[in-house]
Amino acid sequence: MQEKMIDILGSETEIPKKIEGWNHTFQLAKPYIKVNGIGIDVGCREGGFAREMENNFTHIHCFDFRNKKNMFEKNVIDMSKFTYHVCGIGDKEGTTFTTSHAVGRIKDRGDVAVPIKTIDSFDLQNVTFIKYDIEGYELKAIQGSEKTIKKYNPVIVVEQNKGNIYAQELLESWGYKCKGIDKIFNQDYIMVKE
């Protein structure tokens, strides 16, 4: 397999920690994931986590409201395994706003328009894994993925920051259980349907 140097944003000390964190989180989730399925990366940024997923799914759909596709293409080995969608993922279709494309946080305020879609609107089949890392928008994104989640019961990695566990609580109400929390960043929860 061809090796590539990963091109991600961050300082010389941050980049190795990010790569270690993505790998650690995916390795925690991997034993629970069914093989030969579709993966979804919500909040894919420049492709660091997606690269960890690359050899484990038949296809991977990646979502980010900031168009970082050029960097993304440099970071994965085989772009034909990916579909890169430039949109935010939320609980309903429409437009919301943020203050800047430089920051990956949808704030529902500001003057930068962000198109929002739901995962359910894509009607993806055989979804076996979803990662949500969208800086506080996880609950809305999961609400917009309800049909997909309830149909396929994918393994879910969800970032939960600053004591906000609403997304985890929603998943638990749907029969999911937390099987682990990454020990690198202590904010990525591995959720598996019981």
Spell out what each predicted region is.
Residues M1-E194:
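Phosphate/nucleotide-binding beta-alpha loop and adjacent structural elements of enzyme active sites
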